[in-house]
């Protein structure tokens, strides 16, 4: 027969059973804060007939419970960006989660092998591949430890420290590396490769910048919500409890792709001088005349001075203050009560209200002020981030505002603003190495900063690039000393401290799993092998005597 026979009744029964299972799954407490705009039937139809249970979903459950506990206790899961298996194995002793940074991957682990700054222009499998690299290392060290422990007696095991190597991983999904279908595929990759959670930011994909670079271009609020819905839908299709972190770069953004979403209208800049003309047309005309470089920049600068660039509410307030109106303060209050960062008032509504209050059509044109690339000028800020955080909250497990400084007052303003609308919302915070920490606060405040943020609801905090910076510092220091004092640098500043501090990598053969692999060889060869890696003659026997010679 050209086709495979199928029992239609069983097919229908299996579908209805799966729909019921999905509905039951979604009714669990895990999803009490999650909004879905699609049905269980939609998800069941998009699944294959073979059910695959991804271990990363167990890690997601572990992460969710971890953050739930921290939230209840007003404590914090704090971590940093891991570069490699050495990092995750050492971090596991002290930290309860792992971060995988797109910035670090861009500079050190692109699948194209081409280093780059954090522009998310590396292949989209770059960060998922790094997650898998670290996840496989976690699984291996977990197996290795278990085998080692189970060769000991129960009494010996009770005295032997246990390390939870399976710390859940949260990874950087940048802007999603494309449209909705790209985000669905990227999410699938992360699920398959071991991520417990991912974060996605509200920048435009083609112009994405590191959160601490200039020139950031936002997408409209709804477009980013669509990304978050895509992540959840993808996770639902593949049966994962993956956590989604919604990041907003709106605090320092200066451009936006579109004016389509009324929630963004308050923050879009326009020209208030009708004599200024259209900037893009002016620049194009200048270029057609062969004007480039500094002369072209001067034309743009002159236009900017002339245009009277401001937000619409600023233009209205200026009109009232400078015009011939009685009860100016009352007029301004009437306007700002209805038009403010969190009111979601459309420009059309704001313009209508302004005319009712002033009797004038106040000139304001955001089209003529567009940048040469076609983007609209945008003035973000903390309240803009609050607006976006509130909008993203129903579709994300955590909300993160990227900020320019480690400013506690600003962090509190954001937390209070989001939680005023969503009281139980979890928050995330980037303890960025781009901040000058010693300039920002004294050492005693640095020590308490994580805890203080934790009290505000920032349950997950991370130093994005600590893996990069600590590695650079250690290698720079060792290379310098090695160049001057040879093997004394290794013996005295690396190996001896490893021994004294009990860093297990000093016995790197054992750490890498040689004893575990010997056990596998013996198991499949009847208990005897002459090719055991850790047999007689292995040089690590030297470390049984760990005292350094004078």
UniProtKB/Swiss-Prot annotation:
Gene Ontology molecular-function annotations: isocitrate lyase activity; metal ion binding; methylisocitrate lyase activity
Keyword set includes Magnesium: yes
Active site: 210 (proton acceptor)
Localization annotation: Glyoxysome
Cellular component annotations (GO), alphabetically ordered: glyoxysome
Enzyme Commission code(s) on record: 4.1.3.1, 4.1.3.30
Biological or metabolic pathway of the protein: Carbohydrate metabolism; glyoxylate cycle; (S)-malate from isocitrate: step 1/2
Necessary cofactors: Mg(2+)
GO biological process: glyoxylate cycle; tricarboxylic acid cycle
Binding residues annotated for Mg(2+), in chain numbering: 172
Family, per entry: Belongs to the isocitrate lyase/PEP mutase superfamily. Isocitrate lyase family.
Functional note: Catalyzes the formation of succinate and glyoxylate from isocitrate, a key step of the glyoxylate cycle, which operates as an anaplerotic route for replenishing the tricarboxylic acid cycle. Required for growth on ethanol or acetate, but dispensable when fermentable carbon sources are available. Also acts on 2-methylisocitrate.
Protein name as annotated: Isocitrate lyase
């Amino acid at each position: 027969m050209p086709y495979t026979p199928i029992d239609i009744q069983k097919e229908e029964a299996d579908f209805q059973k799966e729909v019921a299972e999905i509905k039951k799954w979604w009714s669990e407490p895990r999803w009490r804060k999650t909004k879905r705009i699609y049905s269980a039937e939609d998800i069941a139809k998009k699944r294959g007939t073979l059910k695959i249970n991804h271990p990363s979903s167990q890690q997601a459950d572990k992460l969710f419970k971890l953050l739930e506990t921290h939230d209840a206790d007003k404590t914090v899961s704090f971590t940093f960006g891991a570069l490699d298996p050495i990092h995750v194995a050492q971090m596991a002793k002290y930290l309860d989660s792992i971060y995988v940074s797109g910035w670090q991957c861009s500079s050190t682990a692109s699948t194209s092998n081409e280093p780059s700054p954090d522009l998310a222009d590396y292949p989209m499998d770059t960060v998922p591949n790094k997650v898998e690299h670290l996840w496989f290392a976690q699984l291996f060290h977990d197996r290795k430890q278990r085998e080692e422990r189970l060769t000991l007696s129960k009494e010996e095991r009770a005295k032997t420290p246990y390390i939870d190597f399976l710390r859940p991983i949260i990874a950087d999904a940048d802007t999603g590396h494309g449209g909705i279908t790209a985000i669905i595929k990227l999410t699938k990759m992360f699920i398959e490769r071991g991520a417990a959670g991912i974060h996605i930011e509200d920048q435009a994909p083609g112009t994405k910048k590191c959160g601490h670079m200039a020139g950031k271009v936002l997408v409209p609020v709804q477009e980013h919500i669509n990304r978050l819905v895509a992540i959840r839908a993808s996770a639902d299709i593949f049966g994962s409890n993956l956590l989604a972190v919604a990041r907003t770069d709106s605090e320092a953004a200066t451009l936006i792709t579109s004016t389509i979403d009324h929630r963004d209208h308050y923050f879009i800049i326009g020209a208030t001088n009708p004599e200024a003309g259209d900037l893009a047309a002016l620049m194009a005309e200048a270029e057609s005349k062969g004007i480039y470089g500094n002369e072209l920049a001067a034309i743009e600068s002159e236009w900017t001075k002339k245009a009277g660039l401001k937000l619409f509410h600023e233009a209205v307030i200026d009109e009232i203050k400078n015009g011939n109106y009685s009860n100016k303060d009352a007029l301004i209050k009437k306007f700002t009560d209805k038009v403010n960062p969190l009111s979601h008032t459309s420009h059309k509504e704001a313009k209508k209200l302004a005319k009712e209050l002033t009797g004038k059509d106040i000139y304001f044109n955001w089209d003529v002020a567009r940048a040469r690339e076609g983007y609209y000028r945008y003035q973000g800020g903390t309240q803009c981030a609050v607006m976006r955080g509130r909008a993203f909250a129903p579709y994300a497990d955590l909300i993160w505002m990227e900020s320019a400084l480690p400013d506690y007052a600003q962090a509190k303003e954001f937390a209070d603003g989001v939680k005023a609308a969503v009281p139980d919302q979890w928050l995330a915070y980037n303890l960025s190495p781009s901040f000058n920490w010693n300039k920002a606060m004294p050492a005693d405040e640095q020590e308490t900063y994580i805890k203080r943020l934790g009290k505000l609801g920032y349950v997950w905090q991370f130093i994005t690039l600590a893996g990069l910076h600590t590695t650079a510092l250690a290698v720079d220091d060792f290379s310098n000393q090695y160049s001057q004092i040879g093997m004394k640098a290794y013996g005295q500043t690396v190996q001896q401290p490893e021994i004294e501090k009990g860093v297990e990598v000093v016995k790197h053969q054992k750490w890498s799993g040689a004893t575990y692999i010997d056990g596998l060889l013996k198991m499949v060869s009847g208990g005897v092998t002459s090719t055991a890696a850790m047999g007689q003659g292995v040089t690590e026997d030297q470390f049984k005597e760990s005292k350094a010679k004078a």
